[in-house]
């Protein structure tokens, strides 16, 4: 137990047992007075060494200093009679130990085991991470060892090695000073303190000696220590024997070893040491078993290798088997002989690599690299082409079988086949299918391959930012391999497949290069006949490949890349087309996938139900969501069929009858829930409010209605009754830069037009105008709402509403010209969905309107405008002034 000395000159805290005495420096002069001058010799490594005489008092003859320096130890305590080395890294501690070595009579320290290793605890901005630094006396155990400094070696300026000889145990009574190093007051143990029964001690001693010898048979460390056992430890001294046994135990934990050190009873000390030895014996046996198993496996592997090599040599002598390299070289040459035409440059490279490969040893680092290179060179189908289908009627049937509509794509493919039939050969082509999601861009590519009789390969470049995915890795890199184009030729086994490059508008860029620029060579008919992959580094002809790219937004494709493609725009499907697609493709496929084709029940999804699905649940341009809703319906039907079937089985199998389930417009909500959409129109009945006009928008999801709302706020008056300042324009609705510019142009055109219609009006001078485009969470941009904005402002300024069944689109110039816009078909489809009867289009878009199917034009009044005067005439003609 450690006592805390209380005196008038001592400061005590609850967490410390540190004693400091005023005027007591002379009492501790042997440990506190250090000198930096010392004579040193050199060891073999060049470090400075301080050596004390070897003939010094040992054990009980060693002095008993009550006040010494304290030295913390890590991992293992120091047992009496043993020698250990301690590495010091704290400069103050090294200086203190160096001072002690000056006087051999004072070269003693008290060693205590730390309870835990230092982990770099920060205190006051200083990292306390060295083992010899103690900041809290409770960090060390209070039973330690009185040790003599035998030797101190300085390796460099920051570290030193201390050799210690342990003499006896001691108790820590006080910590006089927190260092580093610490000053401690100790109480030495006496031999008279030990007790124990002679017979029991003798039995335990014999068992320890027997266990040590048993462990030494399998443990080399024990065997080496046992050689010095007779000289170092008296077998009749149970205390030294227990200390020796504990000190050579490698499996003992610091707590277990400290327990042996603290034990005063000889019998208990021997017993605890024996427990450590028994644990060491079990660990040694386990290590021996593991070592034997590993050795047996290695011996067996070596034996198999030796026999295998002998067998290979015998077979080779008898001509029964050839060397692996010879077999591979023969396989490569046989593969090359089967190709119709290998380019001269490629053949020269292959011959050179085969010659190098024949000289390489199997264990050479170059062996696998060369073999991989030859594997890829011989895997390219040099000159191999798939025989194509030139039957126009068969190709048309294949395309019509898989897809409804898409006439532009089908006609282009049929033209491609016709040219090939006339020429007798087919060159490659680069098509780009652009349109909203779910319109069949990806799936039509597979149908094109089937119609042509070609192999099909698809890879997506969405988010791709590494050029190596296109052009391969250079062979200097570990794990290098060719790019997707060469992988495509190997996978299809032909040089004229149909290759689908999906999501080309979503190419990324990064520090590994620009994939869009890498595709310029791939998609250029004038260059791709000698495409050179970084890995192969030989020209490969990919000019006969039919490339089909897909994109949602052409604006995101770089101009030079887009210029190399033949763009085919796929507009969204209108309501009749969606119903036809669902009836001919989606419903039968969903029934088949749900296992409902062979059931005795009658299942029916009415046309009205499909129409309601397309109108109120899946209004996007494609049919992907429509297919999801149909799948949801068939899954619920499958559950009902199985439930009915199991119910009939439980009652009477013979009583089961065919049931009829009919999905109609009335019970559709029971299967798919409430409608997602209600109406495209914000204002249903009657004339529109002043300042409200419906425009038409075109997005990646198709066409839709786009309202423009304008409201005026009267400006305040000054003291003379005049309006302060001029009118301002505020726009909201998350508009893009182009659309914001359109609002400024529309404001100017509206002001100019108002001055012509009503010269006396000062509406825009005395009012602030706020223009808003509803659905503010949706970003909007583009110039096609120009005429709609001008009409909205004039409706507000003239205090006249416009027709409720009118929608318009067109860009307006500063002089009032109405300019052409895109997406006419999609906008007409959006207008019909919103119930619009009258549409104003730019005159330049008349040719686009003429190409729209006739059923979309039915009951639709269309006006063409080349200037805003025509727009004004149509918009306000049938509405009386209010």
Curated annotation (Swiss-Prot):
Residues 1-34 form a transit peptide. Its EC number is 3.4.21.53. It is found in: Mitochondrion matrix. Residues 687-878 form the Lon proteolytic domain. It catalyses: Hydrolysis of proteins in presence of ATP. It comes from the Eukaryota. Residues 68-281 form the Lon N-terminal domain. Coiled coil: none annotated. One of its GO terms (cellular component) is mitochondrial matrix. The active site is at 784, 827. CDD domains: RecA-like_Lon. GO terms for biological process: cellular response to oxidative stress; chaperone-mediated protein complex assembly; mitochondrion organization; oxidation-dependent protein catabolic process; protein quality control for misfolded or incompletely synthesized proteins. One of its GO terms (molecular function) is ATP binding. ATP binds at residues 435-442. InterPro entries: AAA+_ATPase (IPR003593), ATPase_AAA_core (IPR003959), Lon_bac/euk-typ (IPR004815), Lon_lid (IPR054594), Lon_proteolytic (IPR008269), Lon_Prtase (IPR027065), Lon_prtase_N (IPR003111), Lon_prtase_N_sf (IPR046336). NCBIfam families: lon. ATP-dependent serine protease that mediates the selective degradation of misfolded, unassembled or oxidatively damaged polypeptides as well as certain short-lived regulatory proteins in the mitochondrial matrix. May also have a chaperone function in the assembly of inner membrane protein complexes. Participates in the regulation of mitochondrial gene expression and in the maintenance of the integrity of the mitochondrial genome. Binds to mitochondrial DNA in a site-specific manner. Homohexamer or homoheptamer. Organized in a ring with a central cavity. This is Lon protease homolog, mitochondrial.
